[in-house]
Amino acid sequence: MEPAAGSSMEPSADWLATAAARGRVEEVRALLEAGALPNAPNSYGRRPIQVMMMGSARVAELLLLHGAEPNCADPATLTRPVHDAAREGFLDTLVVLHRAGARLDVRDAWGRLPVDLAEELGHRDVARYLRAAAGGTRGSNHARIDAAEGPSDIPD
C-alpha cells in the first residue's frame, strides 16, 4: 500500500497510529503527552482514531481527550469510528465515541447506519444501545425498542 498523497510525514503520526492500532494504552498516552497530534494522518492517510484497536475503549478515551475528531470519515467507504465499533460489537468503545459527540445517524457508502451493522452481525447489546440513543426506530429497519432497554442498562 502506498502512502496517501498529502499525508503527514511526521514520524509521531505513524507511531501514534501504530500504538493506537495495537491498543497500547501507555504508549498512546506517552505520545500524546509528548505532543503527537491526535488528528494527524499516518503515512497511509489514516488518523489514529480510525485505526485504533476498537476493543480498547481506553485508547479511544485518550485520543478523544486530546482532541481526536470522533466523526472523521473514511473517504472511500464513508465509515466512521462508530461504524467500526458497531460492526465489531465493541459497546464500551461505541459509548465512549458517542459521549464524545460521535454521530450515530450517518450512513456509510452502502447506506448503512451503525445500528444496521450491529444488527446484521448479531451484536444485540450494541444495536439496543444504538436504537435507544437514536430515540427508538429512527433510521433503523426494526420495530420499536422496549423502553426498559435503554442506555441506562449500559455500564459506565
Curated annotation (Swiss-Prot):
Localisation: Cytoplasm; Nucleus
Result, substituting C72G: In an esophagus tumor
Effect of A134V: In non-small cell lung carcinoma
Tissues and organs where the protein is expressed, per its UniProt entry: Widely expressed but not detected in brain or skeletal muscle. Isoform 3 is pancreas-specific.
Outcome of swapping R24Q: Found in a patient with multiple primary melanoma; partial loss of CDK4 binding
Phenotype upon changing A132P: In non-small cell lung carcinoma
GO molecular function, one term: RNA binding
Biological process, per Gene Ontology: apoptotic process involved in mammary gland involution; cellular response to hydrogen peroxide; cellular senescence; glucose homeostasis; keratinocyte differentiation; keratinocyte proliferation; mammary gland epithelial cell proliferation; negative regulation of cell growth
Effect of A102E: Found in seminoma and medulloblastoma tissues from Li-Fraumeni syndrome patients carrying a mutation in TP53; somatic mutation
Annotated effect of mutating G35V: In CMM2; loss of CDK4 binding
Modified residues (Phosphoserine): S7, S8, S140, S152
Keyword Cell cycle: yes
Reported effect, A127S: In squamous cell carcinoma
Outcome of substituting A100L: In CMM2; requires 2 nucleotide substitutions
Alphabetic keyword roster: Acetylation, ANK repeat, Cell cycle, Cytoplasm, Disease variant, Li-Fraumeni syndrome, Nucleus, Phosphoprotein, Repeat, Tumor suppressor
Result when mutating D84Y: In CMM2; also found in a lung tumor and a prostate tumor
Function statement: Acts as a negative regulator of the proliferation of normal cells by interacting strongly with CDK4 and CDK6. This inhibits their ability to interact with cyclins D and to phosphorylate the retinoblastoma protein.
Subunit structure and binding partners: Heterodimer with CDK4 or CDK6. Predominant p16 complexes contained CDK6. Interacts with CDK4 (both 'T-172'-phosphorylated and non-phosphorylated forms); the interaction inhibits cyclin D-CDK4 kinase activity. Interacts with ISCO2.
Assigned protein family: Belongs to the CDKN2 cyclin-dependent kinase inhibitor family.
Protein name, UniProt field: Cyclin-dependent kinase inhibitor 2A
Gene: CDKN2A
